[in-house]
Amino acid sequence: QIRGGSPFLGYYRREGSVESKVKDGWFYTGDAVTKTDRGELVFLERLSDLKRLRSGDTFPPQFVETRLRFSPFIKDIMTVGDEGRDFVAALINIDMAVLSRWAEDKRIGFSTFTDLSQRPEIAVLIRQEIARVNRFLPPHARVQRFANFPKELDPDEGELTRSRKLRREFLEERYGALIQGLYDGSRE
């Protein structure tokens, strides 16, 4: 929320839309932000997109995912966590092009995406990338467990949109057993 004169005139062709967002002189943006030690505001997520864990703590899934996508080894990621779960977990889609070169340089043998994605050396590397990002997150928002997708995500199989956005509900259904394994301790 911000306070002051209206920061904008309104939404195009939606009269009265600003008034519904202003309460007692405060404009409610609908954004979740945090303040750094230097006083800077960092956008986390739309409030409507925050997820709540069993503890009642909320975490910003897209913020966590975006930070992890900065890793050259991670092509895509889907965080998992809801009111029925105690912690944040993640499913990782490795970057085959980058990791295949890395594996060849390290003389790690593999023949397929599945073979490479499930190698212990790859798990160690991804765990290090997650630990790097976790240092900057509050404890409840840190990724505690992860698994690598056993295959590259594919728009033709309905796992991604044509613009390569995750189809979360579809992925949660398709990989439900893998997700459950992260929470019952049978994975990672």
What is each of the regions a protein language model found here?
Residues 30-32, 37, 71-98:
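C-terminal boundary motif of the adenylate-forming
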Residues 9-16, 97-105:
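Cytochrome P450 core scaffold surrounding the K-helix E-X-X-R motif
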Residues 100-119:
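A solvent-exposed, charged loop/short amphipathic helix patch at secondary-structure junctions
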Residues 54-59:
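Short, surface-exposed ligand-recognition loops at beta-strand->loop->(often short) alpha-helix junctions
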Residues 63-70:
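Short amphipathic alpha-helix segments
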Residues 1-53:
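Conserved ATP-binding/catalytic segment of the ANL
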Residues 51, 76-78, 102, 123, ...:
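Conserved C-terminal "lid"/linker of ANL adenylate-forming enzymes
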